[in-house]
């Protein structure tokens, strides 16, 4: 009997992802009307997106959802101030540790979900990261760590006592204008920094004037710099060093009304939105419903925040191509029952080669025990949601159709988990959470940047610290370490953040799973031929209207968490082999044990009769040897088990 292949299951998941993204647009509008978004809708392509069954050609979409330029700015959060990390009570302010003002604690840090931010234990759990909108219309994650290092000298070290490293004015910081490196921040010397080391800002670097170089040559640079710093009142500033105002020649930091900034952030609205049109997204619309068929030709709809809609003709064939069929001789069993639904799910879960192979393709790399544990958690929520979906749908559902939908839903769940845990974006969010949790977290991140050779830093500034290339070289080193901290590959990937990465603030996982099941059922029911060319005939057979979810969950958990028959046979074979080997190695144990037991009794009897010490010593020795041979066989068995497992 033909079933969905791994290719079909993956395509079903892709279809569900795009259709869920379509519904997510209106949910985002409801939850975050002040965070503006752009989106693009186009008919799905079998070549570029996923296989489109002919029955779905009039509704299969490819949806792209992204932050607009203003939305990207609204989502940005820089979580560091002069001496630490922001908390859930830190107001938005500017710091002026250099000639460049830097804002921190933007509203997105803790006001995306204010209730969650104020819970106990969430004081330092920032809800967003720092983003930048690029020329190619992407909201990307930037390297906030290098910005922090350039702008907050206090955070460079843990003890804050290293002269010339953390008791200095900051570098001027600005985003790199090079479009090839949009994530990077560039550091630049300023007059206050150069003055701290008895130098002048010249041509982008810190240097002596020509006549100061002559005096330094005669007196020695150390002596000359000491006198110059004394004349410039540097030592008195260092005695009462203020990390928030590190130099008297820096401008004062800007004053800002943080409450007004927060109110302005919340009051943003997109007046170009067509809410009536977007309500269609939750009604399983067709291309005609969305106005994507103009004069009989398909078009792509692009919405730009605060601007409106544009329609662009598409050149590819959006209509699903019918797959080639091969002769299939297996007859359909028309006596399918509720018991067979259990068989479908159980046999699928026991086919670890297929399921584990799909998970590996998605990106999971774990032991089989860890994979089974994940399957157990998925099934606990997936099967009840599947029953809820079955009772809610108006479609006629057969047992095989529901069984194949379960398989697709399991693969889809793996895809969703992978997006949240394995992607570069997920790793970036984890890294941000560690950085923003405490100063210790910052130090730990710095220690992991193996390519950041801090040995080049000269604390007293006599060698490598002042050429104008120095901040730029350090910025490039930070950027290299920034990418290498995400994975061990040499690939460089710009990390684009999209609204769906914040889905946990918009919907629960259970709701998302339930809604996705309807899309998966639609896709599975629309498939007539699998990727191998076999006829599926999923609509043939008895209809299923309900099933015992408790029994099915128990069956699935047992299958995905306990041993299969093959694993059990392998386990018992190993145990029998160990027992046999252990017995062969201890063939004469009983004879030796009997001899030493007899000697023990004889020695004890002699000691009682003659009361001489030598007999007591023999008695103790024989007793210890007898005890050893009693436990020898068991000891060697468990020792072998410990070494092997």
Swiss-Prot record:
- Give the record's GO CC terms: extracellular region; membrane; viral occlusion body; virion membrane
Q: Which GO terms describe its biological process?
A: viral life cycle
Q: Which UniProt keywords apply?
A: Membrane, Secreted, Transmembrane, Transmembrane helix, Viral occlusion body, Virion, Virulence
Q: Where in the cell is it found?
A: Secreted; Virion membrane
Q: Which residues cross the membrane?
A: 437-457, 590-610, 611-631
- Topology relative to the membrane: Multi-pass membrane protein
Q: Pfam family of this protein, just one?
A: Baculo_p74
According to its UniProt entry, the function of this protein is described as: Plays an essential role for oral infectivity of occlusion-derived virus (ODV) and also functions in host midgut attachment and fusion by binding to a specific host receptor.
The subunit structure is:
Interacts with the PIF complex composed of PIF1, PIF2 and PIF3.
What is this protein identified as? Answer: Per os infectivity factor 0
Organismal lineage? Viruses, Viruses incertae sedis, Naldaviricetes, Lefavirales, Baculoviridae
């Amino acid at each position: 009997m033909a079933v969905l292949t791994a290719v079909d299951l993956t395509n079903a998941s892709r279809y569900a992802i795009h259709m869920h993204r379509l519904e997510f647009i209106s949910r985002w509008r409801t939850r975050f009307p002040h965070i503006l978004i752009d989106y693009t809708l186009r008919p799905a392509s079998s070549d570029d997106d996923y296989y489109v069954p002919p029955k779905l050609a009039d509704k299969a979409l490819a949806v792209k959802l992204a932050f607009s330029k203003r939305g990207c700015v609204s989502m940005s959060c820089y979580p560091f101030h002069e001496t630490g990390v922001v908390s859930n009570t830190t107001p938005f302010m500017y710091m002026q540790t250099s000639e460049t003002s830097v804002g921190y604690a933007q509203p997105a840090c803790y006001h995306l979900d204010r209730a969650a931010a104020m819970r106990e234990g969430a004081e330092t759990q920032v809800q967003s990261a720092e983003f930048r909108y690029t020329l190619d219309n992407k909201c990307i994650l930037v390297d906030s760590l290098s910005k922090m290092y350039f702008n907050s000298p206090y955070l460079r070290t843990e003890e804050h006592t290293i002269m010339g490293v953390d008791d200095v004015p900051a570098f001027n910081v600005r985003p790199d204008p090079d479009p090839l490196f949009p994530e990077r921040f560039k550091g630049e010397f300023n007059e206050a920094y150069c003055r701290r080391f008895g130098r002048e800002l010249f041509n982008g670097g810190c240097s002596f004037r020509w006549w100061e170089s002559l005096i330094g040559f005669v007196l020695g640079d150390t002596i000359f710099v000491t006198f110059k710093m004394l004349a410039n009142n540097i030592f008195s500033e260092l005695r009462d060093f203020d990390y928030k105002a590190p130099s008297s020649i820096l401008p004062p930091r800007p004053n800002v009304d943080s409450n007004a900034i927060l109110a302005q952030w919340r009051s943003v609205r997109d007046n170009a939105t067509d809410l009536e049109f977007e309500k269609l997204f939750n009604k399983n619309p067709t291309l005609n419903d969305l106005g994507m068929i103009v004069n009989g030709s398909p078009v792509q709809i692009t919405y730009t925040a605060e601007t409106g809609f544009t329609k662009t003709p598409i050149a590819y064939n959006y209509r699903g191509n019918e797959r080639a069929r091969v002769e299939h001789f297996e007859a359909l069993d028309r006596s399918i029952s509720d018991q067979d639904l259990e068989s479908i799910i159980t046999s699928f879960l026991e086919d670890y080669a297929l399921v584990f192979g799909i998970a590996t393709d998605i990106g999971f790399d774990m032991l089989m025990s860890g994979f089974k544990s994940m399957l157990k958690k998925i099934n606990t929520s997936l099967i009840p949601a599947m029953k809820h979906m079955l009772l809610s749908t108006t479609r006629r559902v057969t047992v095989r159709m529901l069984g194949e939908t379960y398989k697709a839903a399991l693969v889809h769940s793996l895809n969703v988990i992978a997006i949240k845990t394995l992607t570069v974006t997920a790793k970036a969010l984890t890294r941000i959470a560690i950085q923003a949790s405490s100063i210790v977290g910052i130090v730990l991140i710095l220690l992991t940047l193996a390519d950041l050779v801090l040995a080049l830093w000269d604390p007293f500034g006599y060698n490598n610290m002042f050429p104008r290339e120095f901040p730029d070289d350090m910025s490039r080193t930070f950027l290299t370490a920034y990418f290498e901290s995400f994975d061990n590959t040499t690939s460089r990937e710009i990390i684009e953040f999209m609204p769906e990465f914040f889905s946990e603030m918009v919907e629960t996982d259970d709701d998302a799973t339930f809604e996705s099941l309807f899309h998966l059922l639609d896709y599975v029911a629309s498939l007539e031929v699998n990727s191998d060319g076999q006829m599926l005939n999923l609509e043939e057979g008895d209809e299923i209207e309900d099933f015992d979810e408790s029994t099915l969950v128990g069956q699935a958990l047992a299958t995905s968490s306990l041993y299969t028959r093959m694993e059990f046979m392998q386990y018992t074979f190993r145990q029998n082999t160990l027992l046999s080997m252990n017995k062969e190695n201890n063939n004469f144990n009983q004879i030796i044990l009997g001899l030493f037991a007899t000697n023990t009794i004889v020695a004890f009897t002699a000691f009682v009769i003659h009361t001489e010490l030598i007999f007591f010593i023999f008695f103790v020795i024989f007793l210890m040897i007898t005890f050893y041979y009693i436990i020898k066989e068991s000891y060697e068995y468990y020792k072998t088990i410990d070494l092997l497992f």
